[in-house]
Amino acid sequence: MKVRRRRHTLLPQALLLPAVALFLLFTVAPGGYAIYLSFMKQKAGGGLFGTDNPTTVFAGLENYRAAFGDAEFWHSIGRMLLVAVVGVPATIILSTTFALCLDAKRARLVGFSRLAIFLPYAVPGVVATLLWGFMYLPATSPIGGNTVNYFGSHMVFFSVANVAVWGVLGFNMVVIYTSLRGLPRELFQAAELDGASELQIALRVKLPMLAPTLTLVTVFSLIGALQLFNEPTTLKPVTNAISSTWVPLMRVYTDAFVDNDIYRGAAASFLLIVLTVAATVAANTVLRLVARRSER
Amino acid sequence: MTAATTGTASRAAAGSGGTRPGGPHRTNWIPTIILLVGAVYCVLPVVWIVIASTKTNSELFSSAPFAPSFHGGFFSNLRALFAYDHGIFTRWAVNSVIYAVGGATLSTIVCGCAGYALGKYRFYGSVWLFRVIVAAVLLPQIMLAIPQFLLLAKLGMTNNYAAVILPQLVSPFAIYLCKVYAESSVSDQVLEAARVDGASEWRSFLSIGARLMTPALVTVFLLQFIGIWNNFLLPFVMLNRDNLFPLTEGLYGLLIITGGQAAQYTIVIVGVLVSIVPLAAVFLLLQRYWRVDLVSGGVKA
């Protein structure tokens, strides 16, 4: 079978061409353009208000200095982190708990619960936020909006995180459950014969073996949290608790489209991309170390 | 089945000081109750919106939250929704379908082809290319939305269907999934046999490779469909004409317009309901075809 094992073919290159072209056009080029813009600024032109023929000139690190020196930028990052601190662990803990319960012996109503918990994934984020907005609003709230101020200065972080958790819980649960079903059953039976209780099997046998999947789910949740935009933007019209610069992406949007300073917006969005990549790499490394340690 | 085969084992465990009482047919209450609480949490807002959509505006603020109304509020709300601004809601729904079906179809083709090429062929630069694409998983697509807008605006290409569809076609995760799946499921022997039979590379890709990859392609299609249907930021920055809006944008616009006046809440509520129902139906119908194990399987590789 050594006869011309690989014929000369350009098929793989042809198959890759659309993906590579689109990747260059819509990922690499915009990224590069944003970096370019972040080092530029608008120079006032002639005329009464300096608006005639404005020119773009090199600004050096001015936009970055402005972003770094701006307290509101750091506040927006702080708010995003607060939502993440509430939302990410809640997502992981709840979805893992539900997955373990689905896998538990003699649990009932498993099919129904699985579908019900998965349902919010089919609800678009904006629509989910509108839904929860009505749940939070005192005028319409079925969950005690008259007694609980869901938009209070501390509560608002939980309210926003809740919407995000509600939306992704089911998807994560199914991912974890699927990988749980793929584990060798004999191990659990062996542990059972050794006298381990259902709870002990879940915590000491199943959970450690889920480590790679939990790593993936955590990294995805983290990336999701750093991109927080839909929920606060959609809640903004119904409450004063959320400003137009509440989280970094809203801030970038406001810079670029409301204040018409695309250069500052570009600098801030490039900073965010750097932060996201750094956070993802860090989370991946830490979780891998933890997983390795728990294997020993 | 598991309960039957391990029944004796669990009884043995109970006998040796295990904490679980009972035989194989007894309900395990703790996980069941936890699951039910989770189910109620996830379904509650949807149940509420179904009930709220039956109410007239005054009933919305006066009647008990979970008591449905039968005074014809539902149909008058629906009529008001579809009559709003000369029926623009229908237009938004059609737009959503165009974006999601068109985008997901094209994306499945683009990512499927790329995944197959990376999974089944080794050529100069292929390993390197794959690494770059996998690294792009770290790049949040959504954060690129604003630079994408700036670039497209520079080229005068915003405010049309392509501006929303094109940036979403390449999904690093989908390419990764297709590559891993092609490697494991499209066997070299079968391809070799086709070659010996004189099939061209193109032909063996179309009639063997593509067919064997169907489960991965269906999964990619559904992931992309939901992703595009739910995307908010990209249309939000790319479009400023409301006849191009997808449902999400449209409903958000409705909320802003009606934000100050509670009198319009019923339109938004029934709009939310109408936008959930079709997707939830498609979703429940197709849920056994799409393979989440492919999604989680990626980490084991």
Indicate residue ranges for each PLM-predicted region.
Chain A
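Short, Lys/Arg-rich, polar N-terminal cytosolic tail immediately upstream
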Residues: M1-R7
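A structural signal for multi-pass alpha-helical bundles of membrane permease subunits
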Residues: H8-R296
